Amino acid sequence: MPTSRFIQRFGDRITGVLSGFDRLVLRGSLLAIVSVQGMKRLLWLKHVWLKDFGRWAQQMTEQLKEASCQAARDQNRPIVYLRSANTDKDEAARKIAAEDGITTGLVAILTCVEPCMSFEIYRNPQTHKLEPVYRLRKGLVLYHYWIDSQFGWMNARIQSWLPFSIQVCINGREWLARMMDHNHVGYRRHDNCFMSIDDVAKAQRLMNRQLRISWPKALQRIVRQLNPLHGQMFRGLGISYYWSIYQNEWATDVMFQKASDLAAIYPAMILHGMRTFSSGDVLRFLGRKVHGNFQGEITSDFKDRPEGVRIKHRVKENSIKAYDKAGNVLRVETTMNDPRDFKVLRPKHGDPHSKTQWRPLRRGIADIYRRAQVGQASNDRYLDALAATDTSTPLGELIRDICKPATYHHKRVRALRPWADPDLALLRAINRGEFSVNGFRNRDLQSLLFDHAADNDDENRRRSARVSRLLRMLRAHHLIQKVPHTHRYVLTPYGRDIVSAVLASQQITLQQLNKLVA
């Protein structure tokens, strides 16, 4: 069962666990015309000269705006121009829906000028010829907000300038509410969170169905709403939208019987996370140039909110966080913005008959099921880590075995020295919160265990060999395990308990110890 260790620890206070998409942002691109060569081909097929591009493109824009807004005029819904692109559009749309009593259908169309990628024609000073260029410009964007019969409250936007790029925002919990209403499953809801569900198992089955819908069909319906003239504009050219996932949030909600049940353990969990996951008040870890492929930063922090405290760990563009919602719900949520650090078992892109191998996860919706698997595994590992909070096993008994030599592949491996500085630094490194998302590699540990970059290749090899020996020692003591088909490692449940206990012991003062034994 997912989150089994957490359930074993706190199951008597929990009414159910629900996992699935929260925020899901998809983008549609007309791949045939998002490049200069693609646009040149379209102009050639449309018999449009480069000198006439501006006038022709403006006509296309006016046609799109007129057609996109026609439904609002027909239904007497407002079309509102926003002077600032920074205006909270969701808040503005919800205010309109509340004032007008809208419970289904179109709420409003909000328009504003925003930066967008589009085309323009310029004269090349070297060749003295007109050439199309694809660059960042500012153009009118149309945001449609509506209450969908399938997805519930949602929005989608389309830029009015070529190549008419689209972004669709859906919330999995909002979608689930519609599904439960249709299937007569009772629930109590606060915002995008369910405080209780009459039949959690059935709700989870419904949420799992979200992964199996025909996304091209569902999204084509949205395209027709945003641009009813798409078929007419590109008739006979075979130009259609390619859909990718810009961002997804996979959330696991643990529903407690009472708010007081969660309140009794949540502060200790946050404290546990801040201390043993190396997180604190605006505590940051800069991971610049950890290895040749790493260009981002690694950070962990926590934030006080009016409703409670949120702890968050980031690794490059991806993150995992934990926070309390609606009083009685603990949510752990993995956010994926960059899928390239994750793997999926698939053939080579564009060659379905090639050998199936573990390859980088793609942005396309074809890999949406794997995104769910990665998010669930990440959340489960994080909840496993939280389950180690305040263990009742005596520390001496817990660490006794790791303080003895072990055997690994018929070779003797030394004992850990958990309170010696070198091994303590190693335990802190493998317990960093961001490694709950996708594990860690030899090179990740090198960046944490050495103060500066290696001076030469020989030093690089020596460091790699040293860390390999440390990894072998951790595996011999069953603290970590290898992720299949990768060079990554994750803490085992046993390792979580050991490492959390050792690191937590570093925070205990003599005064606190005296109170415990008094």
Regions found by a protein language model. Give the residues of each.
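Short, hydrophobic-biased segments on the C-terminal half of alpha helices
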Residues: 464-472
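Short acidic, hydrophobic short linear motifs in intrinsically disordered regions
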Residues: 436-459
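Short alpha-helical segments that sit at the start of domains
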Residues: 399-439
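Long, contiguous, compositionally biased segments that the model treats as domain-scale units
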Residues: 1-254
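DNA-binding alpha-helical recognition surfaces that contact promoter or target DNA
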Residues: 447, 469, 497
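Short, amphipathic alpha-helical interaction segments positioned at domain boundaries
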Residues: 487, 493-518
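A short, conserved structural fragment
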Residues: 472-485
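Extended, non-transmembrane interaction/recognition domains
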Residues: 141-400
